[in-house]
């Protein structure tokens, strides 16, 4: 008997891990109603504005910046995270930690659950520079469409846009991007980059 649906959900979810330490159930989660509404209708969630790509989830771990959100803590002066920057340490824990406390710290820091959380990171930029930064989570308004531009080639003009989310605000951003690509002489081909969608 369950009075709360979340209790029932938690009972169904397994917290068991494989022999390598990877959770067996990597895909089940819940959002509170307000949090889900803000995310699905407004594209707003707590974070730093850095989308992490987990290249390897087990040691040797590799976690890098896939892309950043405009006007976010990730791209603020002094932080300046860019695509390809590697995470080396989080809150004093090496990225390859195997302790439960270390893994919990990595998860809490990389994916903050609320606004105002501060975490210390050691990162390695793509030029090899290793540096320490502190990131504080904010309510990040996600850009559904990014990097819209025209690339001139000898065979014609190619329109490019990165489309990240199928959420309510995406429609207007897609229309704006298409209008931008259509300005002038238009384009001959279109690249719709949905690899992070």
List where the protein language model places each region.
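Flexible, low-complexity junctional segments that flank or bridge functional domains
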Residues: 1-196
């Amino acid at each position: 008997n369950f009075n709360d649906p979340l209790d029932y959900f938690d009972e169904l979810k397994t917290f068991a891990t494989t022999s390598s330490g990877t959770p067996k159930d990597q895909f089940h989660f819940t959002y509170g109603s307000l949090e889900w509404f803000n995310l699905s209708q407004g594209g707003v969630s707590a974070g730093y504005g850095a989308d992490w790509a987990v290249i390897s989830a087990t040691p040797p771990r590799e976690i890098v910046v896939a892309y950043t959100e405009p006007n976010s803590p990730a791209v603020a002066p002094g932080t300046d995270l860019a695509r390809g920057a590697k995470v080396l340490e989080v809150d004093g824990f090496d990225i390859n930690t195997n302790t439960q406390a270390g893994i919990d710290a990595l998860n809490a820091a990389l994916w903050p659950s609320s606004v105002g959380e501060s975490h210390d990171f050691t990162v390695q930029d793509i030029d090899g520079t290793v540096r320490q930064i502190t990131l504080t989570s904010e309510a990040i308004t996600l850009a559904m469409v990014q990097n819209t531009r025209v690339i001139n080639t000898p065979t014609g003009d190619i329109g490019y846009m990165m489309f990240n989310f199928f959420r309510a605000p995406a429609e207007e951003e897609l229309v704006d991007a298409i209008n931008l690509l259509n300005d002038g002489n238009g384009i001959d081909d279109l690249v719709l980059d949905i690899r992070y969608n």
